[in-house]
């Protein structure tokens, strides 16, 4: 009987990428297949996030629930990976003695060896070292499950924002060699991938050697240009970028590379210079707006999403008003916004915070309501327009329909003959938008042809 692995992912897209790699590693080494049901699993892994306290505590809550599964199935192995693992290390085993494996983001490739050691010794295995970029040399080729794929181009972050735990859990910035990234993208394209999302904690800080050991360095703009030249790749996205690293070279790339989508996730975190300085973000609101102004001069249709932290220590009503003014001016399409959560070991955790939680919650609700109004307005403005979408597969709500994404990352569901589904999935097609819902669009296919290539550029 085929053994199975269950992975639960918390947090960012980097973690989603890492979770896929955990499955790939265990499939290549032990033949394990992925399952979505923990009760069916022989190995249960939690890929964790420590950016906010709530996410961290959720991990231990979930661990408590799977403990019962282990009691009923003694051979079951339980592992904790990701940023909580890096931060807590062996203390996870002290708190939850039934955990067998603790590994960081940089050591997931060692999972087969850790499993062997656990079985041989009967003792929990902990490996949260930072072996730089070593893991990419030991990962098996990716198994593609659709026309879109993530590609990690670097690890870590060297910005050390005062509130952020990432540099301590993922290490400083280390870029993969250019040829290594391009080889992975080309392999994905050969398997039918048409859209890649380049991943990194601070992706536009990419500085990769042209090849392993080379002294010549490629910047992020160069990487994008090379990826765009790979046959089969039709769209390029990236996340997450940092305003401080947004060079003129990268801005110019939006004029030179049509495959780079007109959608940008650029976290600003706050709209007050005073708070940005306390956060150690390294830019002002004016500098941030200058980047967006230059980009929209090249791509007037650029849609923009961001991250916002409400209730940072010392935030006044005036600071919050400045944040809201920026939200209105930038017309954000989406915002991942949260109340500030102090993380142990970060400088901001020691700052005095005298703002009542109910005030923070009220501000967050106001911010999120404003963003939702923006989302609805932008979605409504798309009704009646023809959008180019990448067809990803059957619709979740109705498998008789198909679903795809626009450049600005909107999900579009549309009817299509069942016989055409295999041909259309993975293709770039034109869809007329007929209706806007809160979190998706509905459209109609404009072109149906017996020749799949007729539905693409």
Curated annotation (Swiss-Prot):
Protein residues bound to [4Fe-4S] cluster 2: 157, 161, 164
Catalytic activity: N(6)-dimethylallyladenosine(37) in tRNA + (sulfur carrier)-SH + AH2 + 2 S-adenosyl-L-methionine = 2-methylsulfanyl-N(6)-dimethylallyladenosine(37) in tRNA + (sulfur carrier)-H + 5'-deoxyadenosine + L-methionine + A + S-adenosyl-L-homocysteine + 2 H(+)
SUPFAM superfamilies: Radical SAM enzymes (SSF102114)
Binding-site positions, [4Fe-4S] cluster 1: 12, 49, 83
Subcellular location: Cytoplasm
Gene3D superfamilies in the record: Methylthiotransferase, N-terminal domain (3.40.50.12160), tm_1862 like domain (3.80.30.20)
Gene Ontology molecular functions: 4 iron, 4 sulfur cluster binding; metal ion binding; N6-isopentenyladenosine methylthiotransferase activity
Swiss-Prot/TrEMBL cofactor(s): [4Fe-4S] cluster
Assigned protein family: Belongs to the methylthiotransferase family. MiaB subfamily.
Stated name of the protein: tRNA-2-methylthio-N(6)-dimethylallyladenosine synthase
């Amino acid at each position: 009987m085929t053994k199975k692995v269950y992975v639960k992912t918390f947090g960012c897209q980097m973690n989603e990428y890492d979770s896929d790699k955990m499955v790939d590693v265990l499939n290549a080494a032990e033949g394990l297949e992925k399952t979505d049901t923990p009760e069916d699993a022989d190995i249960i892994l939690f890929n964790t996030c420590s950016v906010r306290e709530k996410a961290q505590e959720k991990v231990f809550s979930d661990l408590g629930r799977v403990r019962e599964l282990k009691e009923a199935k003694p051979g079951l192995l339980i592992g904790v990976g990701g940023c909580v693992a890096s931060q807590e290390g062996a203390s996870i085993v002290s708190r939850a003695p039934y955990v067998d494996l603790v590994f960081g983001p940089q050591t997931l490739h060692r999972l087969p060896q850790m499993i062997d050691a656990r079985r041989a010794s009967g003792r929990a295995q902990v490996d949260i070292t930072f072996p730089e970029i070593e893991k990419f040399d030991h990962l098996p080729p990716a198994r593609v499950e659709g026309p879109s794929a993530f590609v990690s181009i670097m690890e870590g972050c060297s910005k050390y924002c005062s509130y952020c735990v990432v540099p301590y859990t993922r290490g400083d910035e280390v870029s993969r060699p250019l040829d290594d990234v391009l080889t992975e993208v080309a392999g994905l394209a050969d398997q039918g991938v048409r859209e890649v999302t380049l991943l990194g904690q601070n992706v536009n800080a990419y500085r990769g050697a042209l090849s392993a050991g080379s002294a010549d360095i490629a910047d992020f703009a160069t990487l994008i240009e090379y990826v765009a030249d790979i046959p089969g790749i039709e769209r390029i996205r990236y996340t997450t970028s940092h305003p401080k690293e947004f060079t003129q070279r990268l801005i110019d790339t939006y004029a030179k590379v049509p495959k780079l989508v007109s959608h940008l996730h650029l976290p600003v975190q706050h709209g007050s210079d005073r708070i940005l300085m306390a956060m150690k973000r390294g830019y002002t609101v004016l500098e941030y707006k200058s980047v967006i102004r230059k980009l929209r001069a090249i791509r007037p249709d650029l849609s923009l999403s961001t991250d916002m932290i409400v209730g940072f220590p010392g935030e006044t009503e005036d600071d919050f008003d400045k944040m809201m003014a920026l939200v209105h001016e930038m017309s954000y399409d989406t915002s991942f916004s949260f109340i500030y959560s102090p993380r142990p070991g970060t400088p901001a955790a020691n700052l005095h915070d005298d703002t009542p939680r109910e005030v923070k919650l009220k501000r967050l609700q106001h911010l999120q309501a404003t963003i939702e109004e923006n989302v609805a307005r932008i979605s409504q403005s798309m009704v009646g327009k023809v959008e180019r979408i990448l067809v990803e597969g059957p619709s979740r709500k109705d498998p008789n329909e198909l679903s795809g994404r626009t450049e600005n990352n909107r999900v579009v569901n549309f009817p299509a003959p069942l016989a055409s589904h295999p041909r259309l999935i993975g293709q770039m097609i034109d869809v007329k938008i007929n209706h806007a819902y809160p979190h998706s669009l509905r459209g109609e296919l404009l072109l149906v042809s017996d020749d799949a290539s007729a539905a693409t550029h």
